[in-house]
Each structure stands twice: as structure tokens, then as C-alpha cells.
A protein has these predicted regions:
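An N-terminal assembly and electron-transfer interface module characteristic of large anaerobic redox
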Residues: 1-151
């Protein structure tokens, strides 16, 4: 029988700094959304984030939240909630996982960043359909839920 090799992991040198950067980012978004001291814009991955930052918005990317849902193995429990309200199982799982998480009131941000209870409430939703057409429907849904403009 072949001898099993033990896998060892070497911590990436920048991990602690990156963890702090991400914690500061999400806590900043949370503070902006809960206090109203700063405006929050949701933006798609190839949206005009630089322009939004230049207009003094704190920018949140729902696709990153969906990636967290997938990485934490939560998506499979959340996608059916979006399917149940009419979203096809054949469309973007980022959309359906994220909407499912909203419908169920859960997010991995709670565990990753103590003190954060939900995704930040947007003041505006800004998208670009260059990467996919589904983001228009995704942001339109949230526009109705949060009663904010989607452009």
C-alpha cells in the first residue's frame, strides 16, 4: 500500500493584512448603510465603480456576496427560494443564490464579520450588462425591494 503524504499549508504572508482590509471594507459599508452618514451604491463587477467612488459612494458588489455564498456552501440551500418565486433554475446562480439569501434573511457576512447583520442597504443600484444580461433583472428585483433607483 502506498504511503499517504501529509499535506501542509503555508500561510500566505499577506493573509492577515488582507483579512483586515476586507473587514474594514465590510464594516465601513455596514456603518454607511446603518447610520446614513455615507451613501451606498451596489455595483456589478464591470460597472462604473470608479465613477461611483468619485461621487463619494461606498461601493458594494453583490457578485462578491454570491461568491461567498458559494464558497461557504450555502448556495444549494438558497437557490430554491429564488426558484420558488419564479426564477428559473437555468439562469445565473449568483442571482438566485443572492436573492435566496435575501429572502431567507441570511448572509455569510454575519459569521465572517461580527456586528454585521445583513448586506448593506443600497441608496442606488448601478449595473452594466456587458458581462451578463441577468444583472438587469437582479438589480431590478432589489430596486423594488429597497425602493431605490436602478440605473
Amino acid at each position: 500500500m502506498a504511503e499517504e503524504k501529509k499535506t501542509t499549508r503555508k500561510k500566505i504572508q499577506a493573509a492577515d493584512k488582507m483579512n483586515k482590509i476586507m473587514a474594514d471594507y465590510f464594516h465601513g459599508l455596514n456603518e454607511a448603510a446603518t447610520t446614513g452618514k455615507r451613501k451606498v451604491a451596489w455595483c456589478t463587477s464591470v460597472g462604473p465603480a470608479e465613477l461611483l467612488r468619485a461621487m463619494d459612494f461606498d461601493v458594494y458588489f453583490p457578485e462578491n456576496h454570491s461568491a461567498m455564498l458559494g464558497a461557504t456552501r450555502m448556495s444549494t440551500d438558497l437557490i430554491p427560494a429564488a426558484n420558488a418565486i419564479g426564477y428559473s433554475p437555468d439562469i445565473c446562480s449568483y442571482l438566485t443564490a443572492d436573492i435566496g439569501a435575501y429572502l431567507k434573511g441570511i448572509t455569510p457576512l454575519v459569521k465572517a464579520y461580527p456586528g454585521i447583520e445583513s448586506v448593506p442597504k443600497p441608496d442606488v443600484l448601478v449595473y452594466n450588462t456587458n458581462q451578463c444580461r441577468d444583472v438587469q433583472d437582479w438589480f431590478a428585483w432589489y430596486s423594488k425591494k429597497f425602493d431605490v433607483p436602478s440605473i
